[in-house]
UniProtKB/Swiss-Prot annotation:
The keyword rRNA-binding does not apply. The record marks 181 as: Transition state stabilizer. The gene is gpmA. It comes from the Bacteria. CDD domains: HP_PGM_like. It comes from Glaesserella parasuis serovar 5 (strain SH0165). Belongs to the phosphoglycerate mutase family. BPG-dependent PGAM subfamily. Catalyzes the interconversion of 2-phosphoglycerate and 3-phosphoglycerate. Homodimer. It is an enzyme of class 5 (isomerase). This is 2,3-bisphosphoglycerate-dependent phosphoglycerate mutase. The active site is at residues 8, 86.
Amino acid sequence: MELVFIRHGFSEWNAKNLFTGWRDVNLTERGIEEAKAAGKKLLDAGYEFDIAFTSVLTRAIKTCNIVLEESNQLWIPQVKNWRLNERHYGALQGLDKKATAEQYGDEQVHIWRRSYDISPPDLDPQDPNSAHNDRRYAHLPKDVVPNAENLKITLERVLPFWEDQIAPALLSGKRVLVTAHGNSLRALAKHIIGISDEEIMDFEIPTGQPLVLKLDDKLNFVEKFYL
């Protein structure tokens, strides 16, 4: 069986080189074109899906919609869930990456961005931009909504959704598309492929390119490739 991942298209804050995380920003024209191209690749390669999973952030939802529209599959069920959100970058969200490196040093920022188990500073829950003040998370217990995450914590957040939703869909024979974010997809890939804590630091997923994971009938990893 095959599972297809797509990282959302290039966003407004990708273009501005800002830390994004759980902040809700839109796609750029480049991002829209990336999503259209991804949908056409899937159409040309004959990929059909029974269900699509995405996050509750606009850039991923729009990417999912565009991909499905371009591949003539906009009608299939979509499941939006906060567990597929991008990694929460804490107090770094909204900051310029270059300016942050100048303030804290390249090494410290690299650790915050790439280490598996070290988180950036927390975002104050009272901050107007905190997810605690966003109604799309109002149904969640306060202690579940993050103030900052590393990749390890992101994996712990994503894994229940894999086990409860994505894996059962695959095992039931459904053809699955997951349109999400760089780090939530990296976390899922780490679990599925078996990437080590060290190797995951250098594992990247580019925006808007369909990544196909081939799995056996027990969801063991076989191979991966980009369309």
